[in-house]
Amino acid sequence: MYTGADVKVEGERLSNKKEKAIREAMEALARPLPNKRILGIPFKLMMYNLAGDSVKERSIGGWIRRKFGEPPVLLSSVSIDRNNAVLQSDLQNQGYFQAEVAGDTIVKGKKARAEYTIKPGDQYTINHVDFGSDSSALQTAIDQCAGKTLLKNDDPIDLGVIKAERERIDAYLKENGFYY
């Protein structure tokens, strides 16, 4: 039975706060999620198992299994390679372009967990924001809205902020008659 993912962040120049933020974000991305627990007990899994294997769909046991049960999450449903790719992609979206992710499974008895080791490297930052220079009406409109930019010098590169800036400029241009 799969009990979840553990993420270890290895970085020389990371603050504890940043290391914790990376670890929590990566643990949230790892799939599949283990069976839910209430006070440390996998209650839904217990209900699923108590209903039995050969329960008819229309019986009370079948209803309990469907309504309150949750099938076990097995190690065979865990794709280490896919999770490695997802974690790597998210780190790159946060500006860690040279991050390394390695995953492995650890089996102890009937329980198994995935363990991911992340070496994020240096986080790239925005050195300078330049919207180009041109004498067209479009460039003039972009220059007018450039003062409210979401991209600031020395901020870490974040794909979400870059997309938000692109959408902000797009909305501004559409409000000013640029629809092409």
Report each predicted region and the residues it spans:
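Interaction-mediating elements
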Residues: 1-180
